[in-house]
From Swiss-Prot:
GO terms for cellular component: cytosol; nucleus. GO terms for biological process: L-methionine salvage from methylthioadenosine; purine ribonucleoside salvage. Catalyzes the reversible phosphorylation of S-methyl-5'-thioadenosine (MTA) to adenine and 5-methylthioribose-1-phosphate. Involved in the breakdown of MTA, a major by-product of polyamine biosynthesis. Responsible for the first step in the methionine salvage pathway after MTA has been generated from S-adenosylmethionine. Has broad substrate specificity with 6-aminopurine nucleosides as preferred substrates. This is S-methyl-5'-thioadenosine phosphorylase. It catalyses: S-methyl-5'-thioadenosine + phosphate = 5-(methylsulfanyl)-alpha-D-ribose 1-phosphate + adenine. It comes from Yarrowia lipolytica (strain CLIB 122 / E 150).
Length: 321
């Protein structure tokens, strides 16, 4: 489903390499494979120790020449289930091209009446309801490390996104929901999928003060933290999940219809964010505070560290250990 114009061209028409660091990455979810306001200049095929990413990395430039790396989370043809998304390869590939900040788009179900279908949400917290079958760390047996996850989304990046994305809804009947407007954290529940929630599950998540639910935030956000990349998700509401007693449970047809409508809003959000993100990355007010944080995260004694895992981690953080 290619709802937004002018990002992904055919590999034959684009360069296969790009020499400059690309500090901004955008991960697109369902219905968001292409972005407006950008000119594609390269499409890079990257191999990582964790395999290939979901799609080639497409590098596009703004009119000022600012480069942006785009990755299709579920594959160009949407052939990867949420469980099968190679998140470690995705984050590692973005890290390899120089990304310091990621803005990730995702379709979500709403768990609250005030978050209507086609509204957007900038979440601040996560409840992990995945099943532990997705690799959620670059660290493995023989090379143990721990990362703080009290703030699953980057606070500075989240504030920038919330402030500037709001402008895209100035003349819209839809809204963007932020912590500043709500006066409280907006919690994203991440479930395994690919089936949607039962009504009982959906009501349970509401009782936990969940705001929205998706299948993508975990392990993407955890891996970005380990990669020392600032990460913020922007959620696009497609439905009321299954909690509303007076409505039929969500259907795929309903989701796809709202995905199409959300694409136009997403284009406006991206256009509103590009200039402030370029400025913030240039002056290092976002994307750099995590630098070096993983150097001291390892618990395993040097003599006991697994050589293969160490080599893999060197791809991510050269010279750290």
């Amino acid at each position: 489903m290619a709802f937004l114009p002018n990002l992904v061209a055919t590999p034959m028409s684009l360069a296969s390499s790009y020499s400059k660091p690309v500090t901004l990455g955008i991960i697109g979810g369902t219905g968001l494979y292409k972005l407006g306001a950008l000119t594609p200049v390269a499409q890079i095929d990257i191999d990582t120790p964790w395999g290939k990413p979901s799609s080639p990395i497409t590098i596009s430039e703004t009119k000022s020449g600012f480069p942006v790396a785009f990755l299709a989370r579920h594959g160009v043809n949407h052939d990867l289930t949420p469980t099968d998304v190679p998140s470690r390869a995705n984050i590692a590939a973005l890290k390899k091209v120089g990304v310091k900040a990621i803005v990730a788009f995702s379709a979500v179900g709403s768990l609250q009446e005030e978050i209507a279908p086609r509204d957007f949400v900038v979440p601040t917290q996560i409840i992990d309801r995945t099943k532990g079958i997705r690799p959620s760390s670059f660290f493995e047996k023989g090379f143990v490390g721990h990362v703080g996850f009290g703030e699953p989304f980057d606070v500075a990046l989240g504030k920038l996104v919330a402030e500037h994305a709001d402008k895209a809804f100035d003349n819209s009947k839809y809204k963007i929901h932020t912590k500043a407007k709500a006066g409280k954290d907006l919690t994203l529940v991440c479930m395994e999928g690919p089936a949607f929630s039962t009504r009982a599950e959906s009501q349970l998540y509401r009782s936990w003060n969940g705001a929205v639910i998706n299948m993508s935030a975990i392990p993407e956000s955890k891996l970005a933290k380990e990669a020392e990349i600032a990460y913020q998700m922007i959620c696009m509401s497609t439905d009321y999940d299954a909690w509303k007693e007076d409505e039929e449970p969500v259907t795929v047809e309903q989701v796809v219809s709202n995905l199409t409508a959300n694409a136009e809003s997403a284009t406006g959000v991206v256009e509103a964010l590009l200039e402030p993100l370029e400025k913030a990355l240039a002056d290092k007010s976002i994307g750099y505070d995590l630098d070096g944080s993983m150097k001291f995260a390892v618990s395993t004694a040097p003599a006991a560290r697994d050589a293969t895992v160490a080599k893999n981690l060197d791809f991510l953080h050269p010279g750290y250990w």
